[in-house]
UniProtKB/Swiss-Prot annotation:
The gene is tpl. Keywords: Cytoplasm, Lyase, Pyridoxal phosphate. It catalyses: L-tyrosine + H2O = phenol + pyruvate + NH4(+). Induction: By L-tyrosine. GO terms for molecular function: tyrosine phenol-lyase activity. This is Tyrosine phenol-lyase. Pfam families: Beta_elim_lyase (PF01212). Contains L-DOPA (3',4'-dihydroxyphenylalanine).
Length: 456
């Protein structure tokens, strides 16, 4: 298959090597069949995550050299603040060490115990902070998002009827805020339409309910709007992003994705009282409001990276490279989540491993098998990631049981995608050999990061 050249030149390289299959089997066993616990030196192609694994540009590296490491009032913070205000349109920004820090602040600031947070599908760390602060997360994403085989645009949209029902049943005063993820990670990187954002904003405004976006992959979402939503084909990515955020009261952001850096994040809001409280709280958990746990050089790189992410040539290449991998797997009959999203290809582990029940952790088993057979590291996104109910202690049982092949930005070429696809296609041809797993160590919180498993 023909494919376009990358829209960049490579100035620095890192040597990688493939260890033998016997060695990979041994390494996987030592890691308790958890791909998070593998050593990076033993990975050939690392598709665990797109978080903090980006390649920075020459301009970002140059910006690192003008890092102002003052404890307070760093010039790099003011550059970041100016950039975010211009591109997102929010009045205030509080930097954090990464997106999780912003989630922590928002949850403490916006949630009262006993309230509900409505959102378009959960995310692991986001829901953890919401529940830790006394909220119950309610999934109001459209039903189609839970069906891996449906190829529909904007599967990340909120179901407005579900939102209206929740407001009626629980009362607007009992909804802390609406958490709108753009894009929806665990649905397969599915985008949200501008029309849906606008409609959610209108309904929320009627009831006085705040909306906070999980903006981590907002630029990817903007690309899908430009590509697929009528009326936006001639609108710039920058202008689409700005309109997206005009329908929100604030956002959490992990800079480790669409800001094209290795560390960093921020919390945005328009409300003055919340901003004052956030500045007090960030000192406790992150650092001064002008650095939030970050070095000045990292804030500078984040400001530059956010502008670079808005360049059409970059984001087109980014999304189409992911789509290329998805297309190649689909054409070979490998079951994936449809349509391919913006940051990853999600293998449908239920269809890939139909001989395994959900209690045998098919996605975890598949991720381990992919590494042992191909040297590619991926991530489980199914029942293990979903965790347990805080009320009953029983496993959450997501309808989607997937393995995420997450493409780092500006790191791999199309040739790497070919290698990944060929290896997984070969594995699929003897999928019945994949064995189920069970816990040998289960952490109480965010278990997927450090759990250990063995074959049943």
């Amino acid at each position: 298959m023909n494919y376009p050249a990358e829209p960049f030149r490579i100035k620095s390289v890192e040597t990688v090597s493939m260890i033998s299959r016997d060695e990979r089997v041994k390494k996987m066993q030592e890691a308790g069949y958890n791909t998070f616990l593998l050593n990076s030196k033993d990975i050939y192609i690392d598709l665990l995550t797109d978080s903090g694994t980006n390649a920075m540009s020459d301009k970002q590296w140059a910006g690192m050299m003008i890092g102002d490491e003052a404890y307070a009032g760093s010039e790099n913070f003011y550059h970041l603040e100016k950039t975010v205000k211009e591109l997102f349109g929010f009045k205030h920004i509080v930097p954090t060490h990464q997106g999780r820090g912003a989630e922590n602040l928002l949850s403490q600031l916006a949630i009262k115990p006993g309230q509900y947070v409505a959102g378009n599908m959960y995310f692991t760390t986001t829901r953890f902070h919401q529940e830790k602060n006394g909220a119950t997360f309610v999934d109001i994403v459209r039903d189609e998002a839970h069906d891996a085989s449906l190829n529909l645009p904007f599967k990340g949209d909120i179901d407005l009827n579900k939102l209206a029902t929740l407001i009626k049943e629980k009362g607007a005063e009992n909804i802390a805020y609406i958490c709108l993820a753009v894009t929806v990670n665990l649905a397969g990187g599915q985008p949200v339409s501008m029309a849906n954002m606008r409609a959610v904003h209108e309904m929320a405004s009627t009831y006085g309910i705040k909306i906070f976006y999980d903006a981590t992959r907002c630029v990817e979402n903007a690309y899908f709007i430009k590509e697929q939503e009528a009326g936006y084909e001639n609108v710039s990515i920058k202008d689409i992003v700005h309109e997206m955020f005009s329908y929100a009261d604030g956002c959490t952001m992990s800079g480790k994705k669409d800001c094209l850096v290795n560390i960093g994040g921020f919390l945005c809001m328009n409300d003055e009282e919340m901003f004052s409280a956030a500045k007090e709280l960030v000192v406790v958990y992150e650092g001064m409001p002008s650095y939030g746990g970050l070095a000045g050089r990292d804030m500078e790189a984040m400001a530059i990276g956010l502008r670079e992410a808005m360049q059409y040539e970059y984001i087109e290449h980014r999304v189409k490279q992911v789509r290329y991998l998805g297309d190649k797997l689909r054409e070979a009959g490998v079951p994936i989540v449809e349509p391919t999203g913006g940051h990853a290809v999600f293998l449908d582990a239920r269809r890939f491993c139909p001989h395994l029940t959900q209690d045998q952790f098919p996605a975890q088993s598949l991720a381990a098998s992919i590494y042992m057979e191909t040297g590619v590291r991926s991530m489980e996104r199914g029942i293990v990631s979903a965790g347990r109910s805080k009320e009953t202690g029983e496993n959450h049982r997501p309808k989607l049981e997937t393995v995420r092949l997450t493409i780092p930005r500006r790191v791999y070429t199309y040739a790497h995608m070919d290698v990944v696809a060929d290896g997984i296609i070969k594995l699929y041809q003897h999928k019945e050999d994949i064995r189920g797993l069970t816990f040998v160590y289960e952490p109480k919180q965010l278990r997927f990061f450090t759990a250990r498993f063995d074959f049943i």
